[in-house]
């Protein structure tokens, strides 16, 4: 295992699922998990890494069930966007309590709650060492927060999209259901598509591929994993062009 004294990345986009904030709870935000994540992000800032964050909203709102019951998909997606803003507010607060400067930018205007998304300002804030949290997805219905993560990652010229999940990488099958599942250390975009591996939704994944944006999948619930990832140590699964 190689340990580089310097970080492997200068600027990253960290994608966290809303579910990751739940901890062992079935719903909502576990304050202990939130504070631990804020501390891990703080470590990156102290290493001189510029950090953008996109958080999902699945811990607070899931639109699929309501859509099946007849709710308009656009309405459901708007509710989902607001859930990501709530998570973003919680993360910004946790970072501030950890003495980390952070700004929350929303793709839909919410005057008095958070800033409107502004590309030039986001870049400027990142360069000045502030963590920038991007909320409300892309601002459009029918787009996942994985799509938002890839889009924002490409826009801010991040070197990698780090996708924090509940498993420690990409497997040949669901490791929770199949103990024979094999973990991959590195994959090409083509291999992921050919093997039909579940990394993120197709629209998000092809956007990353088309713009040569590497994706690194790791377990955000594993203490220290995020730091190991940015230091270039063997952690998670890296997906990039071969």
UniProtKB/Swiss-Prot annotation:
Q: State the CDD domains in the record.
A: AAK_UMPK-PyrH-Ec
What are the start and end residues of every segment in region (Involved in allosteric activation by GTP)?
23-28
Q: Which UniProt keywords apply?
A: Allosteric enzyme, ATP-binding, Cytoplasm, Kinase, Nucleotide-binding, Pyrimidine biosynthesis, Transferase
Catalytic activity reported: UMP + ATP = UDP + ADP
UniProt main location, coarse: cytoplasm
The record's section on InterPro entries has: AceGlu_kinase-like_sf, Asp/Glu/Uridylate_kinase, Uridylate_kinase, Uridylate_kinase_bac
Q: Which residues bind UMP?
A: 57, 77, 138-145
The protein's annotated pathway: Pyrimidine metabolism; CTP biosynthesis via de novo pathway; UDP from UMP (UMPK route): step 1/1
Q: Which GO terms describe its molecular function?
A: ATP binding; UMP kinase activity
Query: GO terms for biological process?
Result: 'de novo' CTP biosynthetic process; UDP biosynthetic process
Q: What is its EC number?
A: 2.7.4.22
Question: Where does the record place it?
Answer: Cytoplasm
Any Pfam family matching the protein: AA_kinase
Query: Which top EC class is given?
Result: transferase
List, alphabetically, the GO terms of the cellular component aspect: cytosol
How the protein is activated or inhibited is described as:
Allosterically activated by GTP. Inhibited by UTP.
Report residues binding ATP. 15-18, 58, 62, 165, 171, 174
Q: What does this protein do?
A: Catalyzes the reversible phosphorylation of UMP to UDP.
Q: How does it assemble?
A: Homohexamer.
Which HAMAP family does the record cross-reference, listed alphabetically? Answer: PyrH_B
Q: What family classification does the UniProt entry report for this protein?
A: Belongs to the UMP kinase family.
Question: What is the recorded name of this protein?
Answer: Uridylate kinase
> Which species expresses this protein natively?
Shewanella sp. (strain ANA-3)
